[in-house]
């Protein structure tokens, strides 16, 4: 048995303007090549565009979008007797939020156009309404888990 203690979970810091952890999670995931100031610019422009499009609180739209995309269950590949099975596994809220942020950004990057702030704002608004690629990804994951429910005992 290991004598080491378990590492403390790091709490996500909040961003300087909105004091919101979700915004900071988005910033850290959108970050490329260490350009954090550019990541902040993209996120803040996207938030302003959400404000203009919906004329509601953009942070509530962000929260609603992430809540809509967050999966409850996912599948993990597990090897049993020479064959690999997709085993459905429930995931916690923190991991679910991380997946949701990743899926939202991936769906935003896939959208046509050049301006990332515009693409991200459009994806967030769509996700808050219950449509968009990120929502489709969540539904696809849930379908996979449902289809492989027979392998749930392999956990």
Swiss-Prot record:
**Which terms are listed as keywords in the entry?**
Plastid, Ribonucleoprotein, Ribosomal protein, RNA-binding, rRNA-binding
- Tell me how this protein assembles: Part of the 30S ribosomal subunit.
RNA-binding among keywords? yes
Q: Does the keyword Manganese apply?
A: no
Tell me which InterPro entries the record gives.
Answer: Ribosomal_uS7, Ribosomal_uS7_bac/org-type, Ribosomal_uS7_CS, Ribosomal_uS7_dom, Ribosomal_uS7_dom_sf
UniProt-recorded name of the protein: Small ribosomal subunit protein uS7cz/uS7cy
What Pfam families does this protein map onto?
Ribosomal_S7
Gene Ontology MF terms in the entry: rRNA binding; structural constituent of ribosome
């Amino acid at each position: 048995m290991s004598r080491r203690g378990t590492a403390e979970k790091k709490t996500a810091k909040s961003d300087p303007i909105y004091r919101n952890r979700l915004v900071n999670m988005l910033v850290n995931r959108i970050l490329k090549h260490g350009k954090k100031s550019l990541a902040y610019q993209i996120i803040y422009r996207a938030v302003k565009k959400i404000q203009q499009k919906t004329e509601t609180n953009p942070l509530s739209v962000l929260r609603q979008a992430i809540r809509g995309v967050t999966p409850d269950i996912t599948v993990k590949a597990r090897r049993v007797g020479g064959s690999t099975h997709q085993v459905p596994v429930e995931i916690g809220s923190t991991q679910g939020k991380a997946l949701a942020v990743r899926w939202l950004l991936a769906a935003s990057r896939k959208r046509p156009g050049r301006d990332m702030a515009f693409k991200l704002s459009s994806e967030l608004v769509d996700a808050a309404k219950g449509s968009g690629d990120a929502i489709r990804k969540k539904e696809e994951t849930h379908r996979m888990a449902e289809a492989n429910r027979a392998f749930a005992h392999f956990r």
